[in-house]
Amino acid sequence: KQTLKEDVIKNAVKVINPKNINEFGKIMELINQNILILCDTSSITNKDQQRFIDMVYGGVYGLKGKIKEISNKIFLYIPQNFDLIDDSEKS
């Protein structure tokens, strides 16, 4: 039986502001635990930012998740058990 704290964690959005590409593993662990992540990559150096984004894209898609780019530095990483309803997409 889950506790209230576990239920709250599972229904929460985790906001992450990684400082370097070494934090990739933390994001994959959270996605694997079905935690929705809002990630601001602006603290990662420009040199490493694209590499970090590519690594996370591969990992999230490998776990059957989805990614919504909010801006060029902010991303929503969506585990497989979440649905994305995006009113901003054109029909």
Q: Across the structure, where does each feature detected by a protein language model lie?
A:
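N-terminal leader/presequence segments that are low-structure
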Residues: 1-15
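A generic structural signal for short
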Residues: 15-16, 45
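A general structural motif
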Residues: 16-22
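Terminal membrane-proximal soluble interaction domains of membrane-associated proteins
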Residues: 22-90
